[in-house]
UniProtKB/Swiss-Prot annotation:
Name the UniProt record assigns to this protein: ATP synthase F(0) complex subunit 8
Signal peptide, first to last residue: none
Matching PANTHER family: ATP SYNTHASE PROTEIN 8
Residues annotated as transmembrane: 4-24
A single GO cellular-component term on record: mitochondrial membrane
GO MF terms, alphabetically ordered: proton transmembrane transporter activity
UniProt keyword terms in alphabetical order: ATP synthesis, CF(0), Hydrogen ion transport, Ion transport, Membrane, Mitochondrion, Transmembrane, Transmembrane helix, Transport
């Protein structure tokens, strides 16, 4: 039975895991953290008063 011969299947399994563990995490991580969050200022900003034109 040829499917029990581990020679071709083991190398396919090995190369697929190499792709999953080496190449794909780098590509995925490049898309996750492309925007660095900006730090908020500790000073509170004074909000502008609302304009109520109907009163």
């Amino acid at each position: 039975m040829p499917q029990l011969n581990p020679s071709p299947w083991f190398i396919i399994l090995l190369f697929s895991w190499v792709i999953f563990m080496v190449i794909l995490p780098n590509k995925v991580m490049n898309h996750l953290f492309n925007n660095e969050p900006a730090l908020k200022s500790t000073e509170k900003s004074k909000p502008d008063p609302w304009n109520w034109p109907w009163l």
